[in-house]
Swiss-Prot record:
The keyword Translocase does not apply. InterPro entries: Metalthion_15p (IPR000347). Belongs to the metallothionein superfamily. Type 15 family. One of its GO terms (molecular function) is metal ion binding. Keywords: Metal-binding, Metal-thiolate cluster. It comes from the Eukaryota. Metallothioneins have a high content of cysteine residues that bind various heavy metals. Disulfide bonds: none annotated. This is Metallothionein-like protein type 2. Pfam families: Metallothio_2.
Length: 73
């Protein structure tokens, strides 16, 4: 998987930088799932969704030993 959010340095807990769930290795969050449903009549606003969707293929992924390989975000 690739790193999104503009940061590509592997941080603590095997995460690739800030704002990036690229390597998918979150040992402290593996079995935790939270769902929140908010119902209302206001229209749903999605700001920046298209930008995040196109950022996916930057070629930054976590390699062996929690290192980013390659790091070219």
């Amino acid at each position: 998987m690739s790193c999104c959010g503009g940061s590509c340095g592997c941080g603590s807990g095997c995460k690739c930088g800030s704002g990036c769930g690229g390597c998918g290795m979150y040992p402290d969050l593996e079995s935790t799932t939270t769902f929140t449903i908010i119902e209302g009549v206001a229209p749903m606003k999605n700001y920046g969704v298209a930008e995040k969707a196109t950022e996916g293929g930057n070629g930054c992924k976590c390699g062996s030993n929690c290192t980013c390989d390659p790091c070219n975000c």
